[in-house]
Amino acid sequence: MNDELDTTLDLPGIELQHLLTDPDPTGTRPRRNLQPRNDPLESETLDDWLLTAALPAVENRAALVLEHLIQNTDRTVGARLAGEIARRYGDVGLPPGTIRVTLTGSAGQSFGAFCINGLHLTLIGEANDYVGKGMAGGEIVIRLPVNARYASNENFIAGNTLLYGATGGTFLAAGRVGERFAVRNCGGVAVVEGVGDHGCEYMTSGTIVVLGWTGRNFGAGMTGGVAFVYDRENKFDQRINPQLVRAERIANDADETRLRDLVRQHADATQSAWSRGLLEQ
């Protein structure tokens, strides 16, 4: 032990000799791990394929359309591509809709994480948790499967904690989403057809539209932004957390126009019969 180290008088019974002993007094052994990486034995991931396929378009700022199947073992799809766009162009990203990717199937966790300007992701199917986590721009759209015959507003299409920490971008989903939707949202825009408990928790800015059912404790810790909620059952006052937010009717033309534009955008992008029906009312 180094004799220069001070002694802590109130802990005289603690002996650190073995913890502080130099494991290699000769200095001949490596001080870092030199073993080969033990990566999983798996083929190229969907995210790898997406980055490779889109790289020339990113480099040349050229328009590109891609299609592929997706399954629930495909996690964080789009994150590497978003990272490459950010590395080259920073927060500005690419012009809107430069790279358009359509995926069909069930997406694994964190689909569209860190989405950025210029990246448009469309999922035909369903998604797990953390869709749009940390997204800063771009657009994520989730549509019903082609053969779906059920009512979108009565069924869940994505999991929990969507748009966690988003600072921008747009998220549109033809169905309900799970708990803690838009938690810590700070600038993202979203339209969904229902949310679970704790919606818009700790939200500081942005715009959220809920075209239907909401769970309990909505708006807990919410200090900014706007949420438009279709209170079909007239029970929203029982589900909102009144500590920091209040519920009120739309009282001006600007808010009404903004809401209608967002619902129309949702209907056009998701092909939702539910939002189309609301527009006709």
For each feature predicted by the language model, list its residue ranges.
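Long, distal/terminal scaffolding or interaction modules
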Residues: 1-281
